[in-house]
Amino acid sequence: MYRYPVKSLRGESLARVEIAPGGIVGDRAAALLVASGHARTGKAYRGKEDERLHRLEDEATAVRAAAERGVLVRGEREAPHYFDDSPISLVLAPWLEDAQRICGRALDVRRFRPNLVADALAGVERESDLLGAELRVGARVRLRVTKAIRRCVTVTYDPESDAVDPGILRALAQEREATFGVYCEVLVPGTIVLGDPLLRS
């Protein structure tokens, strides 16, 4: 189980999460915004805009660097979450195995920024097999699968080194129409812990 406190930045692995109607509590609760008010995401950032972005190691340094450039730094809480689509993303182990076969190498699942990673579900081979399905996680949580996730350039970044591998997105586009994983909406909120079963209702 993973949570990403700041959209498009590294996530954290958790053994227990609280799922609210709007998704995992604390997930993508913040985003970096540019002056236009748009969220700064991995889709737009290529690491070339300003080399100083790579040298900021703590909050004080970041604020000082912004002040030197005459940039106003402020916090806003206008949106509860910054999702691309739905509040929960799910990846099944067989889908990861298929992506690894297509790409010809081992892939860290964190590259795809899922919230939930689960084992195989009976009768489910591709994302399309799960569309519209209701899922039960643990004793209480219920989710509905809404759509397959169409992947963007973010998956080309290694989650540890930030090294870029464009071949991953190309391979997924050729054999999977660039889709990997599914989005889910929350039907019944609750708490789930690592190891809770995920079942099709």
Tell me the role of every PLM-derived stretch.
Residues 1-201:
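Metal-cofactor-dependent catalytic cores
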